[in-house]
Amino acid sequence: MAKIWRNRIEAGTQEFSKCPAKYRADVLTLMRQDVEDGVITKDQFESLTGEAY
């Protein structure tokens, strides 16, 4: 389910703030990996999550 949330957040169809608490840590981990893999930038990560990279 965390992967679905990550995909929707990155696609702009959902907001991280609406992500259920039980998935947030996993979503952040997946999104940090996406930064490392070049899928999104650090700025996009911070903008999408409101969290510092």
Predicted stretch roles:
Residues 1-53:
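Viral virion structural and adsorption modules
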